[in-house]
Regions:
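Transmembrane alpha-helical segments in integral membrane proteins
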Residues: 64-69, 148-177
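Transmembrane alpha-helical insertion/packing segments
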Residues: 1-66
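Membrane-helix interface/capping segments
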Residues: 66-85
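Selective transmembrane-helix segments that form parts of the transport pathway or gating/packing helices
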Residues: 21-25, 90-103
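Functional transmembrane-helix hotspots
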Residues: 103-128
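Short membrane-interface loop/juxtamembrane segments of multi-pass integral membrane proteins
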Residues: 124-145
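Hydrophobic alpha-helical transmembrane segments of multi-pass membrane proteins
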Residues: 53-60, 108, 150-158
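Membrane-water interface at transmembrane helix exits
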Residues: 30, 34-38, 70-74, 104-109, ...
């Protein structure tokens, strides 16, 4: 009964929102940091070690953001949290982060670095090895790539966060007896 009252009083929404915004800003900063270090994650010829570093810095921090929010909310609830509440908390972070990362990718590709998508398209054309249909398809999609990239990132982060939230909620749940 006491846990239900605490759950009604303390909602994870504000915490999830703050963590998701922080992660989205971190993602943009990470893009520029990797560029500064000479690691272009859009380069198809990027060495495996650099790809792993970029993925760990991106997805690893995303996973930690979800788990951090679940643990913090569990502490707010007095050290107890139901599976459903832990999952909901993690999924809110994932959904918000997906939305914010998608919006920041739009900002990045349309305002901050419009040439980034041209580099990706040029690399895809080069990889097509003169296949006329592939080149024509890439050229047709060039103007819409920013939409697919932003939408794809939003969906990917949300779905990945859903899976992480399911797993971490099972680990972190602790109900009063």
């Amino acid at each position: 009964m006491e846990q239900l009252i605490l759950q009604e009083e303390k909602k994870p929404n504000a915490l999830a929102f703050k963590v998701a915004i922080s992660f989205a800003v971190y993602s943009i900063v990470l893009i520029y940091l990797l560029k500064l270090l000479g690691i272009d994650s859009t380069n198809p010829d990027l060495p495996i070690a650099e790809k792993i570093i970029a993925m760990v810095l991106s997805y690893g921090v995303f996973f930690m953001s979800i788990i951090y929010t679940q643990i913090t909310h569990k502490k707010e609830l007095g050290g107890y949290i139901t599976y459903g509440r832990a999952f909901s908390t993690g999924f809110k972070v994932a959904a918000y982060a997906g939305l914010f990362v998608g919006l920041l990718f739009i900002l990045y590709y349309k305002v901050l670095d419009p040439n980034a998508l041209d580099k990706i398209a040029d690399a895809a054309i080069e990889k097509a090895n003169g296949n006329e249909q592939q080149v024509k398809g890439i050229e047709m999609m060039r103007g819409y790539m920013w939409i697919f990239t932003a939408f794809g990132a939003a969906i990917a982060y949300t779905l990945l966060g859903l899976i992480i939230s399911l797993i971490s909620a099972a680990i972190l749940k602790k109900e009063r007896v």
